[in-house]
Amino acid sequence: DLFRSATNYVTYYEKKTGGSVTFGRWFSEYVSGSVSLFAEEIKYSDPQAGAPQLILNQIGNQTTTGFRLSLTRDTRDYPMDPRTGWRTSGAFSLGTPYLGGTNDFYKYTLDVNKYTPLPFDTRLSVRARYGVVTGLNTNGENKPVPLTELYFVGGINTMRGFVFGKAGPVSTSNTLLGAASELIFNFDYIFTISEEAKLNGDIFFDYGKGFAGDSVSTPLRSAAGLEGRWISPFGPLRAAYGINLDPNEGERKGVFEFTIGQIF
């Protein structure tokens, strides 16, 4: 696979160019795994005035080379709209200068999701995620973790009811800093609105946080709300409104988001 992307994170601008070679296989009916070798060139530019030093330290060009491993066990009855089953996955990434890159880090993430069928064609989804990324010091340079590898907790795919990344570390000026670790719990009570139209409703409660270091501490952040899900001919569509249950000063009390092409 080859890729090229450009993203405006408001505080800085990111351009990525690279490629990967992936080898994958099924070990059984439910278990699959893969290993990827990758190389990417990253350029951070155009920092916002007053951007934190953490961001300013990474402005310029970087190269990441390394590998990624993943292992997944999936027993869900219908992955696009499950009623029952488990999905458990683990992933590990290593960026190393021994393969020619400038970045030096390791990252691992665990993700467990359980679906339980309930009466009247409803179901309960409970999901837990934990991840850590840590910079290494192979050549004594003590390089920071690339911004693109940090966790940004907050938004429709992590903590609904929060603006993207705002359930994790932010600066005194409310600028996203990214997290070195994350712990997230999502509880979803899903009910069918129209089986023919493949339209579902969802009452959710999210509980989690992103952390500046690799240790997890309480209290976590919390949000609750409503979501609509439609398995459309163009792919899954989701629209969610979440309420921040304990907003800090300057935070929004509610956030509406919409996404297409990804299930949760």
Q: For the regions a protein language model found, what residue spans apply to each?
A:
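Extracytoplasmic gating/loop element in the C-terminal half of outer-membrane beta-barrel translocons
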Residues: 120-204, 210-212
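Outer-membrane beta-barrel channels and translocator barrels
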Residues: 24-30, 76, 117-121, 192-196, ...
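Flexible loop/turn segments at secondary-structure boundaries
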Residues: 7, 42-43, 97-99, 132-138, ...
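C-terminal beta-signal and adjacent terminal beta-strands/loops
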Residues: 205-217, 234, 264
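Surface-exposed extracellular loop regions of Gram-negative outer-membrane beta-barrel proteins
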Residues: 1-3, 68-118, 199-201, 226-230
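Feature captures outer-membrane beta-barrel proteins of Gram-negative bacteria and organelles
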Residues: 17-25, 67-73, 107-116, 148-153, ...
